[in-house]
Amino acid sequence: MDFIKIVNEEFKSGKEHPKFNSGDTITVEYRIKEGNKERIQKYRGVVIRISGHGDKKRFTVRKISDGIGVERIFPIESPFIENITVEKYGKVRRAKLYYLRGLTGKKARIKERRVALSSKD
Protein backbone atom coordinates (compact mmCIF):
# COMPACT_ATOMS: atom_id res chain seq x y z
CA MET A 1 0.00 0.00 0.00
CA ASP A 2 1.14 3.53 -0.74
CA PHE A 3 2.65 5.50 2.18
CA ILE A 4 0.45 8.53 1.47
CA LYS A 5 -2.70 6.40 1.65
CA ILE A 6 -1.57 4.95 4.98
CA VAL A 7 -1.01 8.43 6.44
CA ASN A 8 -4.38 9.66 5.11
CA GLU A 9 -6.16 6.71 6.72
CA GLU A 10 -4.50 7.47 10.06
CA PHE A 11 -5.63 11.10 10.08
CA LYS A 12 -9.20 10.43 8.94
CA SER A 13 -11.70 11.81 11.43
CA GLY A 14 -14.23 9.02 10.85
CA LYS A 15 -17.17 11.32 11.60
CA GLU A 16 -20.32 11.21 9.51
CA HIS A 17 -21.52 14.59 8.28
CA PRO A 18 -24.82 15.36 6.54
CA LYS A 19 -24.81 15.86 2.79
CA PHE A 20 -24.93 19.48 1.67
CA ASN A 21 -24.39 21.40 -1.54
CA SER A 22 -23.57 24.93 -2.63
CA GLY A 23 -26.27 27.35 -1.58
CA ASP A 24 -27.16 25.53 1.63
CA THR A 25 -27.03 27.40 4.93
CA ILE A 26 -25.06 25.36 7.45
CA THR A 27 -23.70 25.70 10.97
CA VAL A 28 -20.21 24.35 11.60
CA GLU A 29 -19.20 23.70 15.20
CA TYR A 30 -15.42 24.11 15.17
CA ARG A 31 -13.03 23.37 18.04
CA ILE A 32 -10.63 26.27 18.70
CA LYS A 33 -7.57 26.15 20.93
CA GLU A 34 -6.64 29.46 22.58
CA GLY A 35 -3.56 29.13 24.74
CA ASN A 36 -4.23 26.17 27.01
CA LYS A 37 -8.04 26.45 26.77
CA GLU A 38 -10.27 24.83 24.19
CA ARG A 39 -13.75 25.94 23.13
CA ILE A 40 -16.29 25.29 20.39
CA GLN A 41 -17.19 28.12 18.03
CA LYS A 42 -20.30 28.02 15.85
CA TYR A 43 -19.88 29.42 12.35
CA ARG A 44 -23.12 29.83 10.38
CA GLY A 45 -23.23 30.84 6.74
CA VAL A 46 -23.90 29.89 3.13
CA VAL A 47 -21.78 27.27 1.39
CA ILE A 48 -20.39 29.03 -1.70
CA ARG A 49 -18.00 26.31 -2.87
CA ILE A 50 -17.17 22.64 -2.44
CA SER A 51 -13.84 21.62 -3.92
CA GLY A 52 -11.44 18.71 -3.87
CA HIS A 53 -12.23 15.03 -3.64
CA GLY A 54 -11.77 12.21 -1.19
CA ASP A 55 -9.89 13.08 1.98
CA LYS A 56 -8.84 16.46 0.63
CA LYS A 57 -12.41 17.69 0.11
CA ARG A 58 -13.07 21.14 1.55
CA PHE A 59 -15.89 23.68 1.55
CA THR A 60 -16.08 27.46 1.85
CA VAL A 61 -18.71 29.09 4.07
CA ARG A 62 -19.58 32.79 3.72
CA LYS A 63 -21.35 34.88 6.32
CA ILE A 64 -21.94 38.59 6.88
CA SER A 65 -20.51 39.85 10.18
CA ASP A 66 -21.18 43.51 11.06
CA GLY A 67 -21.78 44.34 7.39
CA ILE A 68 -18.53 42.73 6.24
CA GLY A 69 -18.42 39.48 4.30
CA VAL A 70 -16.29 36.80 5.96
CA GLU A 71 -15.35 33.52 4.28
CA ARG A 72 -13.78 30.51 5.91
CA ILE A 73 -12.50 27.30 4.34
CA PHE A 74 -13.04 24.06 6.25
CA PRO A 75 -11.50 20.68 5.35
CA ILE A 76 -14.31 18.12 5.55
CA GLU A 77 -12.08 15.52 7.27
CA SER A 78 -10.74 17.97 9.87
CA PRO A 79 -10.54 16.52 13.39
CA PHE A 80 -11.44 19.98 14.74
CA ILE A 81 -14.97 19.90 13.25
CA GLU A 82 -17.31 18.68 15.98
CA ASN A 83 -20.61 18.87 14.10
CA ILE A 84 -22.19 20.17 10.90
CA THR A 85 -25.91 20.91 10.76
CA VAL A 86 -27.85 21.96 7.67
CA GLU A 87 -30.21 24.83 8.52
CA LYS A 88 -31.70 25.51 5.05
CA TYR A 89 -31.36 23.86 1.67
CA GLY A 90 -30.76 26.45 -1.05
CA LYS A 91 -32.04 26.37 -4.61
CA VAL A 92 -29.20 27.47 -6.91
CA ARG A 93 -28.08 26.69 -10.45
CA ARG A 94 -24.35 27.08 -9.94
CA ALA A 95 -21.72 24.99 -8.18
CA LYS A 96 -19.56 27.99 -7.26
CA LEU A 97 -21.47 30.99 -5.90
CA TYR A 98 -18.75 33.63 -6.22
CA TYR A 99 -21.31 36.15 -7.48
CA LEU A 100 -22.62 36.46 -3.89
CA ARG A 101 -19.48 38.42 -3.02
CA GLY A 102 -20.76 41.40 -4.98
CA LEU A 103 -24.31 41.29 -3.61
CA THR A 104 -25.64 42.66 -0.33
CA GLY A 105 -28.97 42.68 1.47
CA LYS A 106 -32.00 41.13 -0.18
CA LYS A 107 -30.16 40.56 -3.46
CA ALA A 108 -27.85 38.10 -1.73
CA ARG A 109 -30.76 35.93 -0.59
CA ILE A 110 -31.04 32.38 -1.87
CA LYS A 111 -34.37 30.68 -2.52
CA GLU A 112 -35.13 27.77 -0.24
CA ARG A 113 -35.47 24.28 -1.67
CA ARG A 114 -38.12 22.14 -0.02
CA VAL A 115 -36.78 18.79 1.08
CA ALA A 116 -38.83 15.85 2.31
CA LEU A 117 -37.09 14.52 5.39
CA SER A 118 -37.46 10.79 5.96
CA SER A 119 -38.73 9.77 9.38
CA LYS A 120 -36.90 7.12 11.40
CA ASP A 121 -39.92 4.99 12.35
UniProtKB/Swiss-Prot annotation:
One GO cellular component, as annotated: cytosolic large ribosomal subunit
SUPFAM superfamilies tied to this protein: Translation proteins SH3-like domain
GO BP: any one term: translation
Gene Ontology molecular-function annotations: structural constituent of ribosome
Keyword Ribonucleoprotein carried by entry: yes
Annotated S-S bridges: none
Keywords noted in UniProt: Ribonucleoprotein, Ribosomal protein
Family designation: Belongs to the bacterial ribosomal protein bL19 family.
Function: This protein is located at the 30S-50S ribosomal subunit interface and may play a role in the structure and function of the aminoacyl-tRNA binding site.
Listed name of the protein: Large ribosomal subunit protein bL19
Species: Porphyromonas gingivalis (strain ATCC BAA-308 / W83)
